């Protein structure tokens, strides 16, 4: 998106604040419906960040896949759960909660140690549409596929494992 510098920076900071507040709302709101709608807000803001950085294909994929399909599915599943039956068997602390907190704490610690060591000056940000090298959608899609299978193989596999665990959890909740 071709925006002047101060407007671009203001929109970037505003979207960042909405992302942080929306993420906190997803985790902290007691009503699962409100959390699901907050997740939709976060996913839309991520799509707007993609538009701001001239990644229109990723923005469209984000809106169609995550907001249009996954978030609607989450809201649909939450609306069919009976809250009184779900919360009466809930233990305050389980072994899975301990394992999850250890994994999340270790991921947080690794991010905190990795982010300051990253050379952010080597990253080239495209803020103008005339700086995009490839205009052909097929070439851009092929480049995304090549990067997913080479440079971003480990994060791609981690996301697939997270989606598999979420699917198993959804099946376990549906069986109860």
UniProtKB/Swiss-Prot annotation:
Q: Which InterPro entries match?
A: NAD(P)H-Q_Oxidoreduct_6, NADH_UbQ/plastoQ_OxRdtase_su6, Nuo/plastoQ_OxRdtase_6_NuoJ
Which Enzyme Commission numbers does its entry carry?
7.1.1.-
> Which Pfam families does the entry link to?
Oxidored_q3 (PF00499)
- Which terms are listed as keywords in the entry? Chloroplast, Membrane, NAD, NADP, Plastid, Plastoquinone, Quinone, Thylakoid, Translocase, Transmembrane, Transmembrane helix, Transport
EC main group: translocase
Q: Which residues cross the membrane?
A: 10-30, 32-52, 61-81, 95-115, 152-172
How does the protein associate with the membrane?
A: Multi-pass membrane protein
| Example GO molecular function | quinone binding
Tell where it localizes.
Answer: Plastid, Chloroplast thylakoid membrane
Q: What is its main location?
A: plastid
Q: Which GO terms describe its cellular component?
A: chloroplast thylakoid membrane
What reaction does this enzyme carry out catalytically? a plastoquinone + NADH + (n+1) H(+)(in) = a plastoquinol + NAD(+) + n H(+)(out); a plastoquinone + NADPH + (n+1) H(+)(in) = a plastoquinol + NADP(+) + n H(+)(out)
Q: Which family does the similarity line name?
A: Belongs to the complex I subunit 6 family.
Q: What does this protein do?
A: NDH shuttles electrons from NAD(P)H:plastoquinone, via FMN and iron-sulfur (Fe-S) centers, to quinones in the photosynthetic chain and possibly in a chloroplast respiratory chain. The immediate electron acceptor for the enzyme in this species is believed to be plastoquinone. Couples the redox reaction to proton translocation, and thus conserves the redox energy in a proton gradient.
Subunit and partners: NDH is composed of at least 16 different subunits, 5 of which are encoded in the nucleus.
Its recorded name reads NAD(P)H-quinone oxidoreductase subunit 6, chloroplastic
What is the species of this protein? Trachelium caeruleum
Q: Corresponding gene?
A: ndhG
């Amino acid at each position: 998106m071709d925006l002047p510098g101060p407007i671009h920076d203001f929109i970037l900071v505003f979207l960042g604040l909405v992302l942080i507040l929306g993420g906190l709302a997803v985790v902290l709101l007691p009503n699962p419906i409100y959390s699901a709608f907050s997740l939709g807000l976060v996913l839309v803001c991520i799509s707007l960040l993609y538009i701001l950085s001239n990644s229109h294909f990723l923005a469209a994929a984000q809106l169609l896949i995550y907001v249009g399909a996954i978030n609607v599915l989450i809201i649909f599943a939450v609306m069919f759960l009976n809250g009184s039956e779900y919360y009466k068997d809930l233990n305050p602390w389980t072994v899975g909660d301990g394992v999850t907190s250890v994994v999340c704490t270790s991921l947080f610690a690794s991010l905190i140690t990795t982010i300051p060591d990253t050379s952010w000056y080597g990253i080239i940000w495209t803020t103008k549409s005339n700086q995009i090298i490839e205009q052909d959608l097929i070439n851009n899609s092929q480049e995304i596929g090549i990067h997913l299978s080479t440079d971003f193989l480990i994060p791609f596999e981690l996301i697939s494992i997270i989606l598999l665990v979420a699917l198993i959890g959804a099946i376990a909740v549906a069986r109860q």
